[in-house]
Amino acid sequence: MSDYQISTDCLHAGYRPGNGEPRNFPIVQSTTFRYETSEEMGKLFDLEASGYFYTRLQNPTNDTVAAKICALEGGSAAMLLSSGQAANFYAIFNIAGCGDHIISSTSIYGGTFNLFSVTMKRMGVEFTFVDPECSEEELNAAFRPNTKAVFGETIANPALTVLDIEKFAKAAHAHGVPLIMDNTFATPVNCRPFQWGCDIVTHSTTKYMDGHALTVGGAIVDSGNFDWNAYADKFPGLTTPDESYHGVTYTQRFGLEGAYITKATVQLMRDLGSIPSPNNCFLLNIGLETLPLRMKKHCENAQAVAEYLQGHDKIAWVQYAGLPGDKYHQRAQKYLPNGTCGVVIFGVKGGRAAAEKFMAGLKLASIATHVADAKTCVLHPASSTHRQMNDAELAAAGVSPDLVRFSVGIEDAKDIIADLEQALENV
């Protein structure tokens, strides 16, 4: 755990230049690395030494940024991937396979829901989706002998459900499995799930971490707190020899703090790819350096937008946990005391047709599939990101047909509100 505040770590964690070295770490744009002898390289292939030999597994630039994100979350180890989808897939597939079972909150990003309910189902991994507001008894009833993890989002995209992390962590640990949390919308600036019992955190770094809609990427951070050895029979991939590395046992060789990420890197990344380019990681780091400043502005602007919409006669409903009357306000005060995120959701009176007319009338805000970057953008999830869901699945995910997802940027709040006002006048 770093001794610095998070705003300092956003600038300095992961890289401290030596005498005469560049203040900004270099982009190591190379596929391979030279060694003097085959013996030296052989030790890398046997995991007996640390170093780099092929960028499909690891690269110095990537690892520098991963170390920064690890520090921001307060974890023990981290890795970067080519997208948030890849991060969520690796996070699950690293400990679960054909014949295994995962519990997930229903209130998650549509792409993640499809990954779980369609793609990973075809791979033999079964998912049970639970209402995030279910009782402890209902949550515990969802577990099976072959359950390997529980998954949720700190702030759900796009429903903005604030998950009760402690409730889900308690249930997961009672059944000997880790809690995996996607912390994309909150970022470690506003919430550190490890402090509430979460074991593994994922991110779509494409969103606030990058912050400028420049690079697609993902991250996985391990807390190092989950005792894989205590439940060795559940997690043989970590606690028994890996034949592809001459019988190395990850928990023995790398300890509880390094086993999970090491396996995901040297086994899954080796076989499946998904490594981001060093250049993309360099660009991601530029975004990370200003993350606290941007999150503060995003939250301030979103609060102003939510308050404006709440009083507008053409708005049917508004949801933003920063509003005192919001159903997640008290929970947000507990888990996200410094602010939630820059996304506000609402419904325009007149339903879907009115929402689409409103969106078409916006001049400053862009209609885009993206969310959580510096420029304001807007989306209708039911016809885009959650289009693959049926009506029942949409309802379970908290996505109504009239829901508008408004990603508030860091422009002047007066200009954002003026754009909303002129668009609503024509509805």
Give residue ranges: language-model regions.
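PLP-dependent enzyme catalytic core of the Aspartate aminotransferase-like
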Residues: 99, 117-118, 126-127, 141, ...
